[in-house]
Amino acid sequence: MEIKEISVPQQGVVADYMNGKKEIQSCFDYMLTEDAFKQRVQDLREREFFRQDLVTHLLEYNTKLQAGEATIQNVKALGDENTYVVIAGQQAGLLTGPLYTIHKIISVLQLAKEKEESLGVKVVPVFWIAGEDHDMDEINHTFVTKNKKIKKTIFHDRNPKKASASESELSLEDCRKWIEEIFKTYPETNFTKDVLQFIDDSLRKSNTYVDFFGHLIMKMFVNSGLILVDSHHPELRKLEVPFFKQIVSKYKEVQEGLHNQQRVIKELGYKPIIETKSNAVHIFMEIDNERVLLEDNQGKFVGKDGTYSFSYKELIEEMERSPERFSNNVVTRPLMQEYVFPTLAFIGGPGELAYWSELQQVFHTIGFRMPPVVPRITITYIERDIATDLHDLQLQESDPFFNNVDKLRENWLSNQIEEPIDERFVEAKKEIIDIHKSLQQFVKKIDPGLSAFAGKNEFKINEQIELLERMLKRNVEKKHEVELNKFRRIQFALRPLGAPQERVWNVCYYLNQFGLDFVDRVMEKPFSWNGKHHVIKL
């Protein structure tokens, strides 16, 4: 594996944050400097955490996932007041979801190791599985290449229920068949059998989406020391009850903090992305197997436009009685994370970084400081055949990241032709239509009744010219079919669906191609935190 860094253009909040623009940096409590991380350690030392209760829960949860010894030791270390965490999170995508989930975990592992060495304190890596998520459409699919097209392959569970990812039971047999269908689209390699067995070992131990995700991630990172947490685990929810109560008692201040911070964001020229109602309580409650967002209505806490209604006392009593019924929304999830974990740093993608910039004053209303927000490592993998295609087309490895691949293809094709086809046909159509318009005037003078027919005649002639243009283009493309297929392969591999590779493709393709130690070998590579994109040649 060979690693190379390229500067990929960023936009908006992310670009300005990474470029050190002071205005947007003022929306965060810590800059990404070593002094800021030292200050963060000092700030965390002044706070209290329910460490022992958390350790008890995490030991039980990670042991069930058959965690390695390094993970168990890291969990136990959390009981020490001088241990801190680097954390990131994601939904429980089937087969771990898009590659960026793996890249987030690699980011967490690397930053935790680096900060432990530089700060001289124990820093452990934590990955937060968003088990409360009810949106199965976000996690029930993966993308594959089939018949020279990119296909979204959806897992259709025979017994779908309106439940969270932590509670949604998987039909193991259906899931196994779905996985087999995915692997039929991959080339069979020396690793295929082992990878399928690896996945099936995790599937057999799983009852829910979160189980499957957790087992697969733990198995993939078994020697890394990674700690997993299911955000919707009933035992964790019990530990969170005091903070849920605090949110309910301060929801107006939370909403005001969000509103004020979004006003700051607007004044800086950015567009806020968090949308909430002015009466939002920022907590979900599970009612009749549905996740209902609570709102304030004249002192009552209501859901679904008043279908459900609770007094403050009733809501608090229900939190104490059934904490597993409650979960956070996009505003309070970061707050709950801050309450539970002594967070040295949060690692997020571009979208997360943008919405965290809207939360600074929300953190302050609770008496927290927002942790350092570190953009995750971004990676694209270039296989040998794709590297060869780039070379054959005289393209740089960075070209697909700076230019639309379709545009690169069009430019290349136009360079193979002496005279541009589009321009010549535009000229020809104009000349022919001008002549025909004159002819129509002549016909109209002699026989006005033929005017409509003359107009149709113009349309037919134009149709035939366009047909000739299409046939010429098709023949030119056929002549250069080999090269154009290279462009298609490059696009599918590096910019599938016009998106970054890591947002579409799944890690299982790479495990199948390069073996079960693929992720371990990627983790051995040195990654920088300078905001540049990492290209790994395989």
Swiss-Prot record:
Report the coiled-coil segments. Answer: 460-484
Quick check: keyword Ligase in the entry? yes
GO MF entries: ligase activity
Record keywords: Coiled coil, Ligase
Domain of life according to the entry: Bacteria
Which Enzyme Commission number(s) are on file for it? 6.-.-.-
Q: Do you know which Pfam families this protein is assigned to?
A: CC_BshC, Rossmann-like_BshC
- HAMAP family to which the protein is assigned, alphabetical: BshC
Family membership: Belongs to the BshC family.
What function does this protein fulfil?
Involved in bacillithiol (BSH) biosynthesis. May catalyze the last step of the pathway, the addition of cysteine to glucosamine malate (GlcN-Mal) to generate BSH.
Can you name this protein?
Putative cysteine ligase BshC
Source organism per entry reads: Bacillus anthracis
